[in-house]
Amino acid sequence: MIGVEHCDRCGFDRSQWNDRDAERTIAHAGAFLVEWSADAPPELMAKLDARRIDDLKAISTSPDLIDEVHHLWHGLVSIADVRRAAGDVVPRQHGTVTQLSASGGGVPKTAISSAAVGARGIEGDVQAARAHHGRPWQALSLWSQEVIDGFAAAGHPIAPGNAGENITISGIDWSTLHGGTIIDIGGVRVQLSAPAVPCQKNAQWFIDGEIALMDHDLHPGSSRWYASVLQPGTIATGDTVDVSPI
């Protein structure tokens, strides 16, 4: 894997990475591998645990920081492959894009009718805190319309785009998603990479600043999801969303 520029198997593209993004990503390698194994059936966990140990060993012995990222992504895709081969897949679901959102930096993001999406996300969308956002696996942020509606019904002053998600989706059971899930949105294919950690900037959308309500670890099925872009294209409000058990 040393020096590979692009990997068709895992989607790794060296040109999309710099040392800072790679270093911050590798710091959470173990958490990534655990997240992509989450909720796997007991009969698979021993196999996934052994694979995770091998992946972490390969990462730790790699001579190059960017190559470490490649090892990590290979490991993640391997986990997805093992789960898929065993029939441990997210159920096929169909939903709809209820809002696309972008901004020149910070929250809230504002609604747009359509967008071109590349490897780095929605063209023209800017992340205010680049140190914590904008890595290839954070190209897009997705959230559930039903989750937002539930918060709003409880009295929280939140609406689509407020929390910084780019794509708000209805009709998908958010509690069924996990790392590695592949979703087709309009003309774009994405892969879920990790749940987004709540940001203090979003405290304004919750009564008493209770951002823990959107924390994946505390409230599974309530968080935004980061996604990498597997196939660039365009998305428009009202487009079909397909969760693929592949």
Regions found by a protein language model. Name each.
Residues 225-246:
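Well-ordered alpha/beta subsegment
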Residues 156-166, 207-223:
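Short, basic/aromatic beta-hairpin or loop at an interaction surface
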Residues 2-189, 194-201, 234, 244-246:
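Electropositive, beta-rich accessory/interaction domains or terminal extensions
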